[in-house]
A protein has these predicted regions:
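C-terminal amphipathic alpha-helical interaction region
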Residues: 1-148
């Protein structure tokens, strides 16, 4: 059985650990989004837009609806991804203003983790559309079923 002081000490240690872990995860996710995912998405968007342009020249009467739909979906997703990346970056910067551990933990839970969930949702959606050779990370199938 813990004394009140021991219990409070454990509480503070666990709270501090939670804050550090979520902060590290958020910064890691932000770096992955900015340095790996967004450049890969832009590269794929460029490829699809060049494909659409080539089809217009080579086959002006051809149905380009599939390519144009992919281009539109990727472009819209990339825009939303870019915005939430900026929001996450801004929200991470605001963490330094939180000095009370419980206030910081609640901010991380209510703001940062929500930003991360939205960023993840958008990244997963774009991953579903992009061919594996464009995506910078292995997909779930590669991770689960690859033999090392």
């Amino acid at each position: 059985i813990f004394t009140k002081a021991e219990l409070h000490s454990r509480y503070e240690i666990l709270l501090e650990n939670y804050c550090k872990v979520v902060h590290i995860e958020a910064n890691t996710m932000l770096e992955m989004a900015k340095k790996d995912i967004m450049p890969a998405v832009m590269k794929y968007i460029k490829f699809v837009s060049e494909t659409v342009a080539s089809l217009k020249v080579a086959l002006p009467d051809a149905d380009r609806s599939a390519e144009e739909d992919i281009l539109k979906r990727m472009s819209n997703s990339a825009g939303a991804f870019y915005k939430i990346t900026g929001k996450l970056e801004s929200d991470i910067s605001a963490i330094k203003d939180k000095n009370v551990p419980l206030q910081k933990a609640c901010y991380l839970r209510d703001v940062i983790i929500q930003d991360m969930a939205e960023l993840r949702r958008l990244a997963d959606g774009m991953e579903e559309i992009m061919p594996p050779e464009y995506y910078p990370y292995p997909n779930y199938g590669d991770i689960l079923f690859s033999v090392i």
